[in-house]
């Protein structure tokens, strides 16, 4: 477990050197936070379509849960007004709790699914909730397989940029 976390930290440090694929927000149902489940061709040889779609659908479900207005959200709002929002100094909102759950889920997916395949999933919060960023790394563990190095997908995702070292 400790070596997996160490490897994830190494991948994050070298994120600016990797090819990046961006999964855009899906506004087909309005402005609710959800991401497109369309499988990017750059990931074709790296991860199974089903695993990718399952991950994005799970994230979309978490974001729907975070934005759901229920009794607890209503009570939070009432308490916030009654205490001039001081209540939030000692209490997390429902939205913050779900965002933490999402961060844990992304960490788990990186450890179990993405990192072993040379991929790194970035929390959408780190990108302003605009995109899911997936960094693609060259195969360091496999012996001489250069088939993934000659993929034609590197030009279509180079519009990302150099802002990956913020953490």
Swiss-Prot record:
Q: What else is known?
A: Shares an exon with the neighboring tail-to-tail oriented gene CRTAC1.
Residues annotated for lipidation of the kind S-palmitoyl cysteine are 78, 81
Cellular component terms per the entry's GO annotation: Golgi membrane; palmitoyltransferase complex; plasma membrane
- Keyword Membrane set for record: yes
Per the record, the major location class is membrane
Q: Where is the composition biased (Gly residues)?
A: 156-167
User: Where can this protein be found?
Assistant: Cell membrane; Golgi apparatus membrane
Q: Does Membrane appear among the keywords? A: yes
What does the record give as the organism's lineage? Eukaryota, Metazoa, Chordata, Craniata, Vertebrata
Annotated Low complexity bias: 142-155
> What name does this protein carry?
Golgin subfamily A member 7B
**Gene name, Swiss-Prot/TrEMBL:** GOLGA7B
Q: What tissues harbor this protein?
A: Expressed in brain, but not in lung, nor chondrocytes.
Q: How is it modified after translation?
A: Palmitoylated by ZDHHC5. Palmitoylation is required for the maintenance of ZDHHC5 at the plasma membrane.
Annotated region described as Disordered, given as residue ranges: 140-167
Q: Which family does it belong to?
A: Belongs to the ERF4 family.
Give one GO molecular function term. enzyme binding
Q: What does this protein do?
A: Play a role in cell adhesion by regulating the plasma membrane localization of the palmitoyltransferase ZDHHC5. May be involved in protein transport from Golgi to cell surface.
Q: How does it sit in the membrane?
A: Lipid-anchor
Gene Ontology biological-process entries: protein targeting to membrane
* Keyword field: Cell membrane, Golgi apparatus, Lipoprotein, Membrane, Palmitate
């Amino acid at each position: 477990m400790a070596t997996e976390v160490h490897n994830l930290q190494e991948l994050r440090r070298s994120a600016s050197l990797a090819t990046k694929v961006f999964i855009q927000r899906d506004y087909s149902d309005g402005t609710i936070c959800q991401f497109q489940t369309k499988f990017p061709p750059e990931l074709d040889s790296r991860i199974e379509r089903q695993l990718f779609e399952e991950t994005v659908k799970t994230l979309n479900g978490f974001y729907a849960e975070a934005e759901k207005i229920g009794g607890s959200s209503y009570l939070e709002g009432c308490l916030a007004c009654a205490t001039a929002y001081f209540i939030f100094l000692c209490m997390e909102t429902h939205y913050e709790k779900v965002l933490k759950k999402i961060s844990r889920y992304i960490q788990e997916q990186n450890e179990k699914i993405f990192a072993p395949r040379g991929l790194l999933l970035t929390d959408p919060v780190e990108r302003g909730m605009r995109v899911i960023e997936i960094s693609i790394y060259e195969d360091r563990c496999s012996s001489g397989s250069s088939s993934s190095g000659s993929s034609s997908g590197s030009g279509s995702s180079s519009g990302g940029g150099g802002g990956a070292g913020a953490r």
